[in-house]
A protein has these predicted regions:
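Catalytic core of membrane glycerolipid acyltransferases/transacylases, capturing the structured
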Residues: 1-47, 91, 106-107
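Non-catalytic C-terminal accessory region of glycerolipid acyltransferases
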Residues: 13-14, 31, 35, 54-156
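Alpha-helix N-cap/loop-to-helix boundary motif
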Residues: 21, 44, 48, 72-76, ...
Length: 156
C-alpha cells in the first residue's frame, strides 16, 4: 500500500490510475491516493474484477497510466495475476517493473511481507526494463517474463 503512495506522491500532476480493492485497506488507500490527485478504480479478484478491469482499460485508453500490484490483493506473493496480463495484452502498454526498499522499515506478518518505511529511512526506488506484451502471446509466457523482470529488481 505505501508503495502506491510513494509512486502517487512522486508522480503528482501526472495522470496516474490505481486499481484498489473494496477492502477496508482499499478504502483507506483510495482516500489517500485520491487526495494526491490520483484516479482510482475499485475492484478485486473476488469482487467486481471484470467490471473494474473494463473501467481501468477504458480510463487507460484516455491517457491515464495504470499502477497495479502484479500479485493482486491476496497473492500469492510474487505470482503475477491475470488482471495485469489482460490489461497489458489489450492495451499494448509497456509494463514498467518498479520496486522499492528502505534502510529502516517495519515489516508486517502478512502474506506479502508488507513494509512501511520508518522515519528517517532512506528509500530507494528501482525501475526495471519494460516488458512489452504481444496481443497473441501465451499467457504463461507473458506471466513468466513479467515475474522475471520484477524479481531482477526486487530486494527482500
Amino acid at each position: 500500500m505505501t508503495y502506491f503512495m510513494k509512486i502517487c506522491y512522486v508522480a503528482r500532476g501526472h495522470k496516474l490510475l490505481v486499481f484498489s480493492s473494496y477492502s477496508k485497506d482499499g478504502e483507506i488507500m483510495t482516500r489517500l491516493e485520491s487526495s494526491l490527485g490520483t484516479a482510482v478504480i475499485r475492484g478485486s479478484t473476488s469482487k467486481g474484477a471484470i467490471k473494474g478491469l473494463i473501467n481501468l482499460l477504458r480510463k487507460a485508453l484516455t491517457g491515464y497510466s495504470p499502477v497495479i500490484t502484479p500479485d493482486g490483493p491476496r497473492g500469492p506473493k510474487y505470482e503475477v495475476q491475470d488482471g495485469l496480463l489482460f490489461l497489458s495484452q489489450k492495451t499494448g502498454f509497456p509494463i514498467i517493473p518498479i520496486s522499492w526498499n528502505a534502510s529502516k522499515f517495519y515489516r508486517f506478518k502478512s502474506w506479502d511481507s508488507f513494509m512501511i518505511p520508518l522515519p528517517g529511512a532512506r528509500v530507494t526506488v528501482t525501475y526495471g526494463q519494460p516488458v512489452i506484451a504481444q496481443a497473441n502471446e501465451d499467457k504463461e509466457s507473458l506471466r513468466a517474463r513479467i515475474k522475471e523482470a520484477l524479481m531482477n529488481i526486487t530486494k527482500n
